[in-house]
Design a protein with these regions (language model features):
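Hydrophobic face of amphipathic alpha-helices that form TPR/SEL1-like repeat modules
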Residues: 14-23, 27, 37, 52-59, ...
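TPR-adjacent "capping" and linker segments in tetratricopeptide-repeat scaffold/adaptor proteins
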Residues: 1-12
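Short helix-capping/linker turns of helical repeat alpha-solenoids
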Residues: 8-10, 23-25, 30, 43-46, ...
Length: 165
């Protein structure tokens, strides 16, 4: 596929093709090609591609690690209520990568993501409430979030519930 064809394609199709290259499904794994496809799709406003592009920048997959670019793409994705973008934006605030560490801001994004069913965010909220990180310690609230994730098969949340009880 050449660049002129890439830019004229549907952003969802570009994203799906990028996922195939990223995972090596039906094609040889090629992170740089995945990055290129995600970027074209993301620039067209496709929130899943924006989140995936943010992950690639944050982890240095197919591109040089760049937390500032990662944050930019996570914000673009999160503004469209993409639960993955919200989760990863929360993670950046929790870790202080690319932004000042801000646990309250991380919790805000985790709640948005977790409320939309993101299991990773639900687990992180369970952890936050269990340990009192960024929120007041609240075992009932911790159990609530762990249960949401555990009911979707999250083994870490299931283990935490076993620990609590």
């Amino acid at each position: 596929m050449n660049d002129s064809q890439d830019t004229n394609q549907d952003p969802a199709s570009l994203y799906q093709l990028g996922e195939r290259y990223n995972k090596g499904e039906g094609v040889s794994q090629d992170h740089q090609e995945a990055f290129k496809l995600f970027k074209i799709s993301a620039e067209q406003g496709y929130s899943e591609a924006q989140s995936s592009l943010g992950i690639m920048y944050a982890e240095g997959i197919g591109v040089k690690k760049n937390y500032i670019e990662a944050i930019k793409w996570f914000i673009s994705s999160a503004k469209q209520k993409n639960s993955s973008g919200e989760y990863y934006l929360g993670t950046m605030y929790a870790s202080g990568f690319g932004v000042d560490e801000n646990l309250q801001e991380a919790i805000k994004w985790y709640k948005l993501s977790g409320g939309e069913g993101n299991i990773k965010a639900q687990y992180e909220l369970g952890e936050a409430y269990l340990k009192g990180k960024g929120v007041l310690q609240d075992y009932e609230e911790a159990v609530k979030w762990y249960l949401l994730a555990a009911n979707e098969g999250d083994m870490k949340s299931q283990a935490k519930l076993g620990y609590i009880y």
